[in-house]
Amino acid sequence: MIKKIESLEILPPKNQLELFGYENYFNSFVKLYKKNKLPNTMLLSGPKGSGKATFAYHFINYILSDKKINKYSIENMTINPQSLSYKSLLNNTNPNFSLLENDTVGENIKIDKVRDMLNFLNKSTYSSDIKIILIDNAEYLNIYSSNALLKVLEESKNKTFFFIIHNSHSKILDTIRSRC
C-alpha cells in the first residue's frame, strides 16, 4: 500500500533529520572514515535539490557526534535532535565546523570569505583535532576565491575535511576538481 503524504514541509538541508536515498554512499563514507581513509576533499555534484547538502550535513553530524552521547544513528540514517553536535551545526556555533557560502543567491563568493575560512583553519579547537568546512554553491566562487581555495586544499592537514557542493560542474575550476 502506498502511503499518502498529507502535507510536505520543505526544510533547509541542515534541518533535515532523516536521510533518504543515500544509504550506500553514506555507509561507504562511514567505512572510509573508520579506516582513516576518507579523502580530505569531497566534491558533491548534482542538480539543485537532489540532497547533496543534506547528505553532507548528515555525514558531518556523524563525524562531529562520534563517540558522544546522542550520536548519529547509522542504522536509521537519522540525526538525534537532542545531540549537541546537531544543535551547534544548526546554530552555526560548532568550533570544528565552518560554512562557506554566498551571502545572496546568485552572488559570487568573495575572497574575504575564503580568508575567513583560513582564519578558522588556523585556530585550535577545544574538543578534537578535526576541522570540517562545507562549501555550498561552489560554482559561485570567483576566480580569486577559487585560487585562494586551491592553495588551502593543497596545504590541508590530515584531520581537515572539505565538503564542496555545487550544482554546475562546468563552473568549477579543473584544478579544484582534480583535488577532490
Residue ranges of predicted features:
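Short regulatory helix/loop adjacent to the ATP-binding pocket of P-loop NTPases
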Residues: 144-155, 170-179
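Short acidic capping loops at alpha-helix termini that bridge into adjacent secondary structure
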Residues: 96, 159, 178-179
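Short glycine/proline-centered loop/turn elements that form peptide/ligand docking sites
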Residues: 164, 168-170
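Conserved catalytic/switch belt of AAA+ P-loop NTPases
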Residues: 122, 147-164
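Hydrophobic residues in beta-strands of the RecA-like P-loop NTPase core, especially within AAA+ ATPase
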Residues: 44, 135, 149-150, 166
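Clamp-loader machinery-focused feature within the broader ASCE/P-loop NTPase space
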Residues: 1-144
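Short, cationic motifs built from Arg/Lys/His that form the positively charged side of catalytic pockets
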Residues: 131, 179-180
